[in-house]
UniProtKB/Swiss-Prot annotation:
UniProt-listed GO biological process terms: tryptophanyl-tRNA aminoacylation
NCBIfam families, A to Z: trpS (TIGR00233)
Key words, A-Z: Aminoacyl-tRNA synthetase, ATP-binding, Cytoplasm, Ligase, Nucleotide-binding, Protein biosynthesis
GO cellular component terms, A-Z: cytoplasm
UniProt short sequence motif 'HIGH' region, positions renumbered to this chain: 11-19
InterPro entries named in the record: aa-tRNA-synth_Ic (IPR002305), Rossmann-like_a/b/a_fold (IPR014729), Trp-tRNA-ligase (IPR002306), Trp-tRNA-ligase_bac-type (IPR024109), Trp-tRNA_synthetase (IPR050203)
Protein name in UniProt: Tryptophan--tRNA ligase
Classification lineage: Bacteria, Pseudomonadati, Pseudomonadota, Alphaproteobacteria, Rickettsiales
Binding site residues for ATP: 10-12, 18-19, 146-148, 186, 195-199
Binding site for L-tryptophan: 134
SUPFAM superfamilies referenced in this protein's UniProt entry, alphabetically: Nucleotidylyl transferase
Listed HAMAP family: Trp_tRNA_synth_B
Length: 330
């Protein structure tokens, strides 16, 4: 029996190269080996202020990118989180067993809320509980995530164990965390110490999956390196050039040693020119297919509804099982 994998991307802002290399590219490989659930995290998206039209378009665009990148809806279950109401229902049940102190330790809330945490919405504070529900509702065996989500996954495991201990039986599967070695943490093109992010106000800090070829060239050409004239890999002392090398390695499948040797006597200009070409070669087919799919909203909606119906079968089973243990009438 195939193991179950679950992951998703929040439907806010434009998806970028970090999303592709850190998540979607790996999912495409996993769909052949696992029973996969890949969702659009639209409920998480409204923890920030987002316009109605922007959210609606973002849901469709993220779905189109999933498909354009190679996810096959006949092999995996693709759905919008909001279309499976059981996510919110299980989230409430988990809220009622999770100690407040656990949530107060979550570093991402502190980062996203900023200095005035009192103005942040409750949804942002409770974000990790909904994330736990997203995972536990499908009894996922494996959850592929970036390093920055590791704390949330550890919380998910703790919550599952609380439920299981409370009712003295394994109701919820305690998932394993999968952090791949390559591509999970692509950094900003302007600051090698910051993760590439949709929320960064500087557009030149990232390569968006829908960027034109010319814009990709410009962004890579202006990507920050350092004062040294040679190419080498050291994330601690040379974070910017190391980040560009990580991108090159992830897209070219060449070893780091070979890449560095190839450009040892050629300098940054030639390296950046070739890197831009590699990025374009990988992203242009995705961009073109995405634009084609966005012109067929009826097809995209059909995929969402089909995926939601399939997801609801397992989700409702889990929620009813948990509710029964609490004592609710099913």
């Amino acid at each position: 029996m195939k193991k179950t994998v679950l992951s998703g991307v929040q439907t806010t802002g434009a998806l970028h190269l970090g999303n592709y290399l850190g998540s979607i590219k790996n999912w495409v490989k996993m769909q052949e080996e696992y029973n996969c659930f890949f969702f659009l995290a639209d409920l998480h998206a409204i923890t920030i202020d987002i316009k109605t039209s922007e959210l609606n378009n973002s849901i469709m665009e993220v779905l189109a990118i999933y498909l354009a990148a190679g996810l096959n809806p006949d092999k995996v279950t693709i759905f919008a989180q909001s279309m499976v109401k059981e996510h919110a229902e299980l989230s409430w049940l988990l809220n009622c067993v999770t100690p407040l102190g656990w949530l107060k330790r979550m570093t991402q809330f502190k980062d996203k809320a900023g200095s005035d945490q009192c103005k942040a919405c409750l949804g942002l504070f409770a974000y990790p509980i909904l994330m736990a529900a997203d995972i536990l509702i499908y009894k996922a065996d494996i959850v592929p995530v970036g390093e920055d989500q590791k704390q949330h996954l550890e919380l998910t495991r703790d919550i599952a164990e609380v439920i299981n201990r409370r009712f003295d039986k394994e109701i919820l599967k305690v998932p394993d965390i999968l952090i791949s070695e390559t591509g999970t943490r692509i950094m900003s093109l302007r600051n090698g110490l910051k993760k590439m992010s949709k929320s960064d106000i500087a557009d030149f800090s990232r390569i968006n999956l829908k960027d034109s070829n010319d814009l990709i060239y410009q962004k890579i050409k202006k990507a920050k390196t350092d004062h040294l004239s040679f190419i080498s890999y050291d994330k601690k002392t040379r974070p910017e050039i190391s980040n560009l090398l990580d991108i090159y390695k992830s897209l070219s499948k060449e070893s780091m040693e070979k890449i560095i040797n190839n450009y040892q006597n050629q300098g940054f200009a030639k390296f950046k020119e070739d890197l831009a070409e590699i990025i374009i070669t990988n992203l242009q087919p995705i961009r073109d297919k995405c634009l084609e799919l966005m012109n067929d909203k009826e097809y995209l909606l059909k995929i969402l509804h089909k995926g939601a119906e399939k997801a609801k079968i397992r989700a409702s089973e889990t929620v009813n099982e948990v509710k029964k243990q609490f004592g609710f009438i099913i």
